[in-house]
């Protein structure tokens, strides 16, 4: 094991480290996928539990995560620069479809991404309005906000941020950029500008939450197609897993968690059988594909105290039947 494979660093504390990896029920010779490498906390811990015959494929779309992954000098490990929705293509390329013993996902934005002002994820640090997890492709938040309509932005803020003042905020943003065109002034281009504009548009302030919190979340989710990515992975994950292969998924907001919970529940229940059929229960084939493992797990008080950003995390685990 390379000496660099520590489980955390000064800049990033891995959330639910032991719980998420334990959820995989690691086999020492198994083949695993870390779909969200980040800064490598989960990957390094998985590697520490595998034998020389084990294998770990890590995936991330953030170029900085890829650079961090290249520090791991381990023949059992490989990194793929891609989003986790492309795990099926990666498995197909490596001839691993149906052979994966576990897939781990740690959804959302990482602490380093939040802390690096130039990434544009945080309203707490002034930086360019970017918000892309993969800075090599796609529209930045600034570029998208220049062209979006009030109606479309309202929908995004409501759908992905559950923002009650979505119409007010959307109107303020679109009007600001329209005014910039008319008066030849600068468009919204900084996180601090956007946060201040949102704050002014919101009539009532929550004592415990910055008024820009939900809007920043919504714009980030839209820019990165986060829920589409998750839905795509969930729809294909079962075909990637070997029998008894595990899904271990950490989510950080209710939209993600509802998707994961609904998927696992549906696949563990199997197909609905029309009522009234002349069949006994033992004759019904429901085609169940997953078994839910335990209850949802949240961080301990000690973990939350050590890492307040872990507060909203929730882990769900299921096993392929």
UniProtKB/Swiss-Prot annotation:
GO molecular-function term, one example from the UniProt record: rRNA (cytosine-N4-)-methyltransferase activity
One of the record's GO cellular component terms: cytoplasm
EC number assigned by the record: 2.1.1.199
Q: Which InterPro entries match?
A: RsmH (IPR002903), SAM-dep_MeTrfase_MraW_recog (IPR023397), SAM-dependent_MTases_sf (IPR029063)
Please give the catalytic activity noted in the UniProt record: cytidine(1402) in 16S rRNA + S-adenosyl-L-methionine = N(4)-methylcytidine(1402) in 16S rRNA + S-adenosyl-L-homocysteine + H(+)
Q: Which SUPFAM superfamilies match?
A: Putative methyltransferase TM0872, insert domain (SSF81799), S-adenosyl-L-methionine-dependent methyltransferases (SSF53335)
Name the GO terms of the biological process aspect. rRNA base methylation
Subcellular location(s): the record lists:
Cytoplasm
Residues bound to S-adenosyl-L-methionine are 40-42, 60, 84, 106, 113
A matching Pfam family: Methyltransf_5
* Keyword rRNA processing set for record: yes
First-tier enzyme category under EC = transferase
Q: What does this protein do?
A: Specifically methylates the N4 position of cytidine in position 1402 (C1402) of 16S rRNA.
Name of the featured protein = Ribosomal RNA small subunit methyltransferase H
**Organism listed in the record:** Haemophilus influenzae (strain PittEE)
User: Upper taxonomic classification of the species?
Assistant: Bacteria, Pseudomonadati, Pseudomonadota, Gammaproteobacteria, Pasteurellales
Gene this protein is translated from = rsmH
């Amino acid at each position: 094991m390379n000496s660099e494979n520590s489980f955390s660093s000064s800049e990033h504390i891995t959330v639910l480290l032991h719980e998420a990896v334990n959820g995989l029920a690691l086999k020492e010779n198994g083949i695993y996928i870390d779909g969200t490498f980040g800064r490598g906390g989960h990957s390094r811990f998985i590697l520490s539990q595998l034998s020389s015959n084990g294998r770990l494929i890590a995936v991330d779309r953030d170029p900085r995560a890829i650079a961090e992954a290249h520090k791991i000098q381990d023949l059992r490990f490989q990194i793929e620069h891609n989003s986790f929705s492309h795990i099926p293509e990666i498995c197909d390329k490596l001839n691993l479809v149906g052979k994966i013993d576990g897939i781990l996902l740690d959804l959302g934005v990482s602490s380093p991404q939040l802390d690096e002002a130039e990434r544009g994820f945080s309203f707490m640090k002034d930086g360019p309005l970017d918000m892309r997890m993969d800075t090599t492709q796609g529209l930045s938040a600034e570029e998208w906000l220049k062209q979006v309509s009030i109606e479309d932005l309202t929908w995004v803020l409501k759908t992905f941020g559950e923002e009650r003042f979505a119409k007010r905020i959307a109107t303020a943003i679109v009007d600001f950029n329209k005014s910039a065109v008319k008066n030849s002034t600068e468009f919204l281009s900084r996180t601090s500008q956007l946060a201040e504009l949102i704050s002014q548009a919101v009539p009532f302030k929550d004592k415990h939450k910055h008024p820009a919190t939900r809007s920043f979340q919504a714009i980030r989710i839209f820019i990165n197609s986060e829920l589409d990515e998750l839905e795509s992975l969930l729809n294909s994950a079962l075909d990637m897993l070997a029998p008894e292969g595990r899904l271990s998924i950490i989510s950080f907001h209710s939209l993600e968690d509802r998707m994961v919970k609904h998927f696992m529940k549906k696949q563990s229940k199997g197909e609905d059988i029309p009522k009234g059929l002349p069949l006994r229960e033992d004759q019904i084939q429901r085609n169940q594909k997953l078994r839910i493992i335990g209850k949802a797990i949240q961080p301990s008080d000690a973990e939350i105290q050590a890492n307040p950003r872990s507060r909203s995390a929730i882990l769900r685990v299921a096993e392929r039947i």
